[in-house]
Design a protein with these regions (language model features):
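CBM-like carbohydrate-recognition segments
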Residues: 90-207
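Extended ligand-binding clefts on enzyme/binding-domain cores
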Residues: 2-136
Length: 207
């Protein structure tokens, strides 16, 4: 992701999704071997031993993870895996993610940390963490919930995004804006991208 720093799995996954979509469009087989080998590593070597979730960050030689899994990165992992992994792995990761990272009170959303719930702190990727709730994790989880047809989860996440994001309306421009997006990684553009990740095959199904 950056020179001389750990490798972020979600950043790698964007590349994998791009190659996967290329193969879907052109069927050349040019990148199929690389895709297969990457996904095999993801399902075996790069899983967090404590949770079974895909790691958030790896050492530069891709041999082991450098930190505990986190809500913001895992939410993005799940949303991107929904595009390119086999259904069983994508669903299993999403179910594990929900089990470990859903925070039901005082506001429904995605927690940033498994082992702590800070009253308030700030993270460059997660944004302002309040009562342990991750703004980025909550927004990015919309993608997986939408793609996998988890409509109840999607609805509750959208309610939180609208409320906690502090939606403001510009009547002159006829637009809405998440004030939180001015200080957090995820604003309305990311939320729109995630909430419109519709898979036509799941429109009439629920997890």
């Amino acid at each position: 992701s950056f020179p001389d720093t750990p490798i972020f799995l979600p950043d790698m996954l964007y590349t994998i999704v791009a190659l996967h979509n290329y193969e879907l469009l052109y069927g050349s087989g040019k990148y199929q071997d690389a895709l297969s080998r990457w996904l095999e590593k993801a399902q075996t070597v790069w899983l967090d031993k404590e949770t079974g979730l895909l790691a958030s960050m790896l050492t530069r030689k891709l041999r082991k993870q450098t930190s505990k899994v986190r809500g913001s990165y895992t939410a993005l992992n799940c949303s991107l895996l929904a595009f390119c992994a086999d259904d069983a792995f994508a669903h299993d990761q999403y179910k594990l993610f929900k089990k470990l990272f859903i925070k039901k009170s005082p506001v429904f959303g995605i927690r940033e940390f498994i082992d702590k719930s800070p009253m308030f702190s700030f993270d460059v990727d997660a944004g302002p963490i309040v009562f342990g709730l991750s703004p980025s994790g909550t927004t990015l989880a919309l993608g997986a919930a939408t793609w996998l047809g988890d409509w109840e989860m999607r609805s509750r996440l959208l309610q939180t995004a609208s409320t906690a994001g502090d939606t403001i309306v510009d009547e002159a421009q006829n637009t809405c804006h998440y004030r939180l997006g001015e200080v957090a990684l995820c604003g309305e553009a990311v939320a729109l991208g995630m909430r419109t990740m519709v898979n036509l095959q799941t429109l009439n199904t629920n997890l």
